Amino acid sequence: MVVRACTRPGLVRAALACAAILLWTMTSWSAEPRRVLIVHAFGHAYSPWSDMAGSFRNELIKNSKEPIDLYEVSLDTARVQDTKDEAPFVEYMRALVAGRKLDLIVPIGAPSAFFVQRNRQLLFPSTPILIVGADRRRIPAYSLTDKDAVVLLDLDLPAYLANILKLRPETTEVSVVVGNSPVERYWTSELRRDFQPLADRLKIEWFNDLTFDEMLKRAAAMPPTASIFWFLLSEDAAGIP
């Protein structure tokens, strides 16, 4: 089941509908509460994914006809980026749910979805998965099973620049704030490609190869006709989150 959403409220509503289908049609009735594991990509509140997770969590508990036993794990992917280093997270998850049958796994965002997919057979081979808040580019259909559902963002990257030009038509230069973690390097490539048609209209400067202090200095020296587009910054060029 694949659902695409363009807005955060729409995404949360679609995720709740998918969760209901997975929880109450793909699992058998039980007197025990429904056990749901939410997997976060980052180790701290990081918008928009933390906002999506918070809304989903609150609405799921509020609207469920049965008790929800909720578990949450944060992977801190900004710091732990090599898959060889994720064994402690696997062991923690194993200990967290030992002796308990999970009814649904909900990874929020693409990095947590990749982690869950890599370790699925080891941790929860028969549990349905609902991927929420990843972009459609990141989750190919072949990576899903018949027990999975996805509620994906459909990001219109050129629309970001179009919106800047609509709000500030005098803009001649845009600085793109984006970090240098693996996920940010992916998005830098996507942004560069999708922004290319506007290269003759705007000077586009990329901050992905700068430290945070260098970003601040560069931003402070920008001319009045420049705009800053903050896309994603979880790790700067020095590897500092």
Question: PLM features: residue spans?
Answer:
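Short hydrophobic alpha-helices and adjacent helix-cap/hinge residues
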Residues: V2-P241
